[in-house]
């Protein structure tokens, strides 16, 4: 498990997440989407593949199919979810 900071422009907020770095990034995106939907009391988006997760540290788009670890994400990484 890693602790990562994720900025969500849609709600203009930063959140700290404890994430499993060994699961596919798309699974992490599902978890983020679910948490944000509960926070803003909206329905969770149906098409998670319409969203992307960027690394703020490297400026790269994360591959949905690779794990966070394989995408170079580690403890303390900063990401943007759009």
Where are these regions (language model features)?
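Ubiquitin system architectures
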Residues: 1-82
């Amino acid at each position: 498990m890693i602790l990562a900071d994720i900025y969500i422009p849609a709600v203009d907020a930063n959140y700290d997440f404890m994430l499993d770095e060994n699961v596919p990034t798309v699974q992490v995106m599902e978890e983020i989407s679910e948490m944000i939907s509960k926070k803003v009391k909206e329905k969770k988006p149906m098409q998670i593949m319409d969203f992307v997760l960027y690394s703020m540290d490297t400026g790269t788009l994360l591959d949905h199919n690779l794990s966070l670890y394989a995408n170079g994400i580690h403890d303390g990484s900063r990401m943007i979810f759009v």
